Amino acid sequence: MKFSKKNIFLLLLIFHQPIKSEINLSDSDLFKTLTSHIYLKATFNQQTLSQGILRQVEGKIFASREGKFRIEYLEPLNEVFISKGNQLIKYDPLLEQLEIFPASYLLSQGIVNLISLDLYSLEKYFQIVSCNEIATKSSCKIIPRNKESFIKSAEIYLQKNLLNKIIFIDNFEQQVIISFKDLSHHFFEDTIFEFEAPIGTDVIYHSKDLQ
């Protein structure tokens, strides 16, 4: 079953870094912790529950605090999302189609900003509602300040001070669960954010300014 475009952008995950053990989440230092690492690389599993139907997809994510990210979905989507901060591109190999969105589109996506915005921007676009810690597990609930965001709320879960999963509810009352593994914050080359569509690919611009 094909994922809707809005649902795909929602997942853009949220992917992020470990919480330092000396930081108490109840002190609302979550955003400082999220921005304490420049690079993030991980694999993920996304489950979407909508009207009793469960859909799953796996993928890989690369992200940089310089406003860049790359998300690669495996079967059945096989889609690629890349942003260098100035625009967002989506490539669908099955449709042989490349879509280009303006940077302003990213701000409405909510969760995707957690992987690329700086501390000032995170505090501007998100609000921490509450945080809880039990033994080696902790979680924080956040909500977007932007009323046009596609999400209503999100819960960030950590285990042994590492990002474990994120659960969020979108404006269509769908529950999305993103589980992470093989998380790394090691340096990687910016070439991962480069993309050149195959010859013959249809290109769709979602803003006249991008043409």
Question: Where in the sequence are the language-model features?
Answer:
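Gly/Pro-enriched, hydrophobic low-complexity segments
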Residues: 119, 123-127, 132-207
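Flexible, processing/modification-adjacent segments and terminal tails
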Residues: 23-48, 54, 91-152, 209
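Short hydrophobic/aromatic-rich beta-strand segments that constitute the beta-sheet cores
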Residues: 42-44, 69-73, 88-91, 142, ...
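An acidic-aromatic
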Residues: 60-110, 173-177
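Sec-dependent signal peptide recognition
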Residues: 4-10
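N-terminal secretory signal peptides
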Residues: 39-51, 60-62, 68-72
